[in-house]
Amino acid sequence: MSDIEARVRKIIAEQLGVEESQVTNEKAFVADLGADSLDSVELVMALEDEFGIEIPDEDAEKITTVQSAIDYANTHQKA
């Protein structure tokens, strides 16, 4: 597991109040991990803070799974 993947999983677990072991790449935030719309907004904000990035609303709407969050962080993180 890459450093970015580990950081994303930790943030998701903390934001959604689930065990990190439940946060697997194929899980969807709403359907599998019980997130609501406020959780999703807070999760995006936490990812922005952690990786020093700004996630536009149109991109945030597409981040719906653990893997999509990891992929976005990998692609957009600041060096």
UniProtKB/Swiss-Prot annotation:
Domain Carrier: 2-77
GO molecular function: acyl binding; acyl carrier activity; phosphopantetheine binding
Pfam families: PP-binding
O-(pantetheine 4'-phosphoryl)serine: modified positions: 37
Naturally occurring in which organism (per UniProt): Verminephrobacter eiseniae (strain EF01-2)
Gene Ontology annotations of biological process type: lipid A biosynthetic process
Keyword Cell wall biogenesis/degradation listed: no
Lineage: Bacteria, Pseudomonadati, Pseudomonadota, Betaproteobacteria, Burkholderiales
Subcellular location: Cytoplasm
Homology family: Belongs to the acyl carrier protein (ACP) family.
Purpose: Carrier of the growing fatty acid chain in fatty acid biosynthesis.
Domain of life: Bacteria
Cellular component terms per the entry's GO annotation: cytosol; membrane
Entry protein name: Acyl carrier protein
Pathway recorded for this protein: Lipid metabolism; fatty acid biosynthesis
Keywords: Cytoplasm, Fatty acid biosynthesis, Fatty acid metabolism, Lipid biosynthesis, Lipid metabolism, Phosphopantetheine, Phosphoprotein
PTM note: 4'-phosphopantetheine is transferred from CoA to a specific serine of apo-ACP by AcpS. This modification is essential for activity because fatty acids are bound in thioester linkage to the sulfhydryl of the prosthetic group.
